[in-house]
């Protein structure tokens, strides 16, 4: 399929997607019943969309195009109410978190969807292993060239986004020692990590044309980059966050990305170059492994900075943009999180250290989601 023209959208508008876990009490393993839930709610959702993701244990909640995080929060709240009622009616529960702590990938059923079945044919067991749960945020752009500039700008802060949302320390019944283990699942995919370097939309069109020669890439949706342009929506999509345990944290993360995008496209503080990416995967690894306790390295100067310190610096820089976007509350909440040193990954570990089981952890996550 040829790459569509870049659809011009209103700059800095938002679209947010949350991949949720569908679980079966009282054992709290992943269910295989998302299709049943989607059928139950499809006529009751008035704004946004509830739809499939890769496997039958995943339920995606997606907003419509939103002006700001308050509108997005309202849509999510309404969807949450409908989904929780339908889940209760079918003896299921819903929770966030980037991974389910003890599910077995071999049990996951890929949805009966043409694209997902084609992806299963291409990637085999990797698709079942990709039963992990992320938050994606789309930001509107006025042109393809703006989208490429924004993508490179946001890529500088991928470690910050990962660390602030880290919520996947457990996988396959084991403490991974990572704050966010979810991104590691995609490391075997040939398109994992950052987008190959291009400097404008024309070069991106040539890149996509080259990728399509492999026959594995039919559309942008077949690319698993950390951040990708979405020409059919007219957006840049950030894909590195774990699904948070609460709606409020998900909305705060979206506000962070919206405000950062506004700062980047308004101030144009960087002259992007390919060398910016030399240490990308090392810095990304630091965030996945250690969260905000990680250390990032500047590829141009060699300077090393604690991620906590650099995140506080980012929040300060984007505060005026956050005010203009109506996202000041999000930046203030994230600032409190960084200063306090609290994060969802550590809270999960604390629960287990205090004697809680992994089954009890999932049950707790369901209670948190329903109570937010």
Curated annotation (Swiss-Prot):
Which superkingdom, per the lineage? Answer: Bacteria
Q: Name one GO biological process term.
A: modified amino acid biosynthetic process
What are the entry keywords?
Answer: ATP-binding, Ligase, Nucleotide-binding
Q: Mind listing the GO molecular function terms for this protein?
A: ATP binding; glutamate-cysteine ligase activity
What is its EC class?
Answer: ligase
Instruction: Give the catalytic activity.
Output: L-cysteine + L-glutamate + ATP = gamma-L-glutamyl-L-cysteine + ADP + phosphate + H(+)
State one Pfam family annotation: GCS2
Task: Please state the Enzyme Commission number of this protein.
Answer: 6.3.2.2
The text of the family note is: Belongs to the glutamate--cysteine ligase type 2 family. YbdK subfamily.
Query: What does this gene product do?
Result: ATP-dependent carboxylate-amine ligase which exhibits weak glutamate--cysteine ligase activity.
Give the quaternary structure. Answer: Homodimer.
Tell me the PANTHER family matching this sequence.
Answer: GLUTAMATE--CYSTEINE LIGASE 2-RELATED
Q: What is this protein called?
A: Putative glutamate--cysteine ligase 2
Which species is listed as the source?
Answer: Escherichia coli (strain 55989 / EAEC)
Gene label: ybdK
